[in-house]
């Protein structure tokens, strides 16, 4: 004889195992019989949805509100298994949307290559070495040019500071070139002055020579002595 009796369905279960009872409780016939049982009970007691809370009284109302299972069944709340299912569906949806927005193989690599191309050739235009840049710029590689290119590499050749450094470098190079151009002229002027000094000295000696200066008088004296 079966051990389990269902008072809602008014039957004895042929399988009284936990699995059999769980299947019976979750069945459609048991649920409909349970609803009908409580409807008949409320009708016999004269309980309607309007006077349901007043019929239970304040103590029963407090028990209902204090019961966590009843709180979960209140409007706006859901049982724990429904919450769990909703969270699972939400997580699956978010994962699908995340995969949808992720870049796919070939397009992702192309975008990455495009970004690397722009960062390599546009954001850092001064990655060439300073010696090659100095040979291209037209002035020899020196201390000032090396400092300039190190500064320009640090600033990536952008902004007003880079332009100011370029202007300062050009002005320094022009000043050095002017000094180099002026120094040979000064040396040549000094050489010409030194070369001209002996010539002027010889000219003065010729003018101050007593023999040359009295040459005319000596001849005149000779002539005078001869005439006498």
UniProtKB/Swiss-Prot annotation:
Residues 211-221 have a biased composition (Low complexity). Coiled coil: none annotated. SMART domains: ZnF_U1. Residues 179-228 are annotated as: Disordered. It is found in: Nucleus. Signal peptide: none annotated. SUPFAM superfamilies: beta-beta-alpha zinc fingers (SSF57667). One of its GO terms (biological process) is spliceosomal snRNP assembly. The keyword Protease does not apply. GO terms for molecular function: mRNA binding; pre-mRNA 5'-splice site binding; U1 snRNA binding; zinc ion binding. Belongs to the U1 small nuclear ribonucleoprotein C family. This is U1 small nuclear ribonucleoprotein C. It comes from Plasmodium knowlesi (strain H). The lineage of its organism: Eukaryota, Sar, Alveolata, Apicomplexa, Aconoidasida.
């Amino acid at each position: 004889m079966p051990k389990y009796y269902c008072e809602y369905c008014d039957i004895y279960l042929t399988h009284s195992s936990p699995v059999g009872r769980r299947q019976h409780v979750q069945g459609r016939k048991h649920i409909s019989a349970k609803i009908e049982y409580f409807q008949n009970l409320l009708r016999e007691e004269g309980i309607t949805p309007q006077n349901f809370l007043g019929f239970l009284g304040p103590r029963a109302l407090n028990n209902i509100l204090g019961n966590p299972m009843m709180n979960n069944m209140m409007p706006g709340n859901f049982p724990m298994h429904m919450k769990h299912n909703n969270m699972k569906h939400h997580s699956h949806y978010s994962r699908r949307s995340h995969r949808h927005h992720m870049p796919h193989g070939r397009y992702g690599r192309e975008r990455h290559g495009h970004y690397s191309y722009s960062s390599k050739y546009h954001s850092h235009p001064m990655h060439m070495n300073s010696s090659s840049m100095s040979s291209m710029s037209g002035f020899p590689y020196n201390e000032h040019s090396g400092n300039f290119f190190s500064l320009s590499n640090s600033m990536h050749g952008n902004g007003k500071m880079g332009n100011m450094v370029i202007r300062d470098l050009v002005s320094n190079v022009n000043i050095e070139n002017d000094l180099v151009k002026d120094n040979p002229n000064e040396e040549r002027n000094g050489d010409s002055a030194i070369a001209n000094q002996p010539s002027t000295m010889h000219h003065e000696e010729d003018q101050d020579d007593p023999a040359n200066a009295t040459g005319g008088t000596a001849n005149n004296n000779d002539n005078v002595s001869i005439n006498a």
